């Protein structure tokens, strides 16, 4: 007999937010805010001037495909059972289809020019298969149906962070949200792919932390869930790991394909995340939602300029060429 789904889970599933009306509303996102905090001028080129540049890579293709495979597995597992998911889903085939499909999509977006080669494509594919195989074998460490329900994958958030700017809406999609009936708590999980996992520097990167902090804040506001009943976690999938018998291994965790990290999310941290969004909105938007016509400063550095899609175009920005 199927478990009775808790009413709070049904309520969230059945009440998605109203879609953005782009005729008069503007959407912002974590990625937009992150770009602005790195370099306001880059944000202006992309979002005000609408000068789009191809930014995908084998890393983004890989990440999208792994996300899709993981989310499909969890959808089936929680809808039926983990045994059924293990039996009925060929993870390698599903991942391969998603991987090839996403590459083809981005290939077309790149004016039908390749941005990877066969050797690199094969390496990343084999890494993905290894991650998914390891996850299936160790799944019970991370996900269970005992008193736990899947609220959804790619759960949408659409909300106005600043009520003085009602036409500026924050939009995001939560990778995985679960609900534990025993403790009456929700967990928001953000899946990340990484070469070797996150080091201490990455974990302490406040800009990275803001993504989940804002998801927690806005999930709470959108569905009326107390903040203290919401947990957050980065679920980091590693492409490269040491063998458990490797002489250089310092900890068994170095052989794990999964790394979990829950950033602090108390009042102070949430306050800093809210301030970052409000500062972004105040700097960039008018009260009616229009983008301000102003000078957006350039903040050149080796890090920001190296990853900037406009770095070769001096007519758009010459500030970073000393760092190239």
Where are these regions (language model features)?
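Long, acidic, intrinsically disordered low-complexity segments
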Residues: 1-28, 160-161
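Nuclease catalytic cores
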Residues: 33-34, 38-79, 125, 129, ...
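Active-site-adjacent bridging/hinge elements
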Residues: 37-46, 185-192, 278-285
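A short beta-strand motif that forms part of the nucleic acid-binding face
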Residues: 49, 192-195, 236-238
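A non-catalytic, helix-rich entry segment at domain boundaries
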Residues: 69-156
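Short, solvent-exposed loop/turn segments that connect beta-strands within catalytic domains
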Residues: 80-85, 162-167, 180-185, 223-226, ...
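Non-catalytic protein-protein interaction segments used by genome-maintenance enzymes to assemble
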Residues: 149-220
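Metal-dependent nuclease catalytic regions and adjoining charged, substrate-binding loops involved
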Residues: 217-324
